[in-house]
């Protein structure tokens, strides 16, 4: 019954996926992708045509001047660190106008003291929280922008917060407001979990840089590692010098044997993201009917692939994650347990029986072991797998007496 009710929404998701599929295809054809581009290089990686062509494809998809798409970028957090730290200098200030960013950013910024943080380089940080209703505190943002404000970081996805994920349209409104006050400020969007969810990306509404991970949406489940930064030419140049070395920049960086997976994963990404979106909507609909608070709720529009469900107890959180793990194609026999994961301020439990370690476009669930014991569910390389994962999570909760089935 739930799936029948969702038919109209699923049709709309398919329409967006088709649009984005053709957008990716068009960029690949425009840049004349050939078989030779699928092979990698070794050593320094000079004249890596596959790498350079893929970066032009990303720039076309995101409608930017340039892009950096590299296996040497380890994860989303690393991509953000490269983008931010390369475009700031001592005495500059970083501003987050959408509240506190994801936990792993704390140590980059120096919110939690850490070796090599921006704070150690005399780069200050200011933050303006969202208003209680989830809207932007425009007055607070106006006051926070000063002569030192050099870069603004806007996290699209909610992360581990209970705030709404931002639509591309809302991000555009925020960027316009900021640029009207200080046109030269660099606006960067953490695009993790948001790629291909809408027909447009934040770089099409004024973002100077969009940043993400290839083991999330744009890798399509095939990229074994990597990250991307797409944006203004000068910003990307700075990022490339930080990732490699001053004087080297984008010219070096061997792709070994990942090019084929990067290309093929990108080609599949719009349909993979569509399946993950359907899974998230299905999760909200079944868990809401079972009496749990879901963010976003069953009816709300989606701007990323993450579904948060407030389970209320540690037992519920653990049971949910055990169900997701049991539904995995890899390591389905393993039992996830909470642990002190680097970069987080509380124990975290993670379930991911994935082909790529830590891949969150594959069926996965995680959450910090603290009030309100919310689990964050995302991914599923196919909609059918996402659906099965959700049903397994309900089964495990039912077995523990934490879920009533009407």
Describe these PLM feature segments.
Residues 66-69, 92-95, 150-151, 184-187, ...:
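Structural motif
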Residues 17-21:
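Acidic, PIN/NYN-like endoribonuclease modules and their adjacent C-terminal/linker elements
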Residues 1-7, 14, 24-30, 34-37, ...:
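Conserved PLP-enzyme active-site core in the AAT-like
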Residues 38-68:
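Active-site-flanking structural segment that lines cofactor/substrate pockets
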Residues 288-405:
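Conserved C-terminal alpha-helix-loop-beta "cap" of PLP-dependent enzymes
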Residues 60-64, 114-123, 329-330:
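Short helix-loop-beta junction
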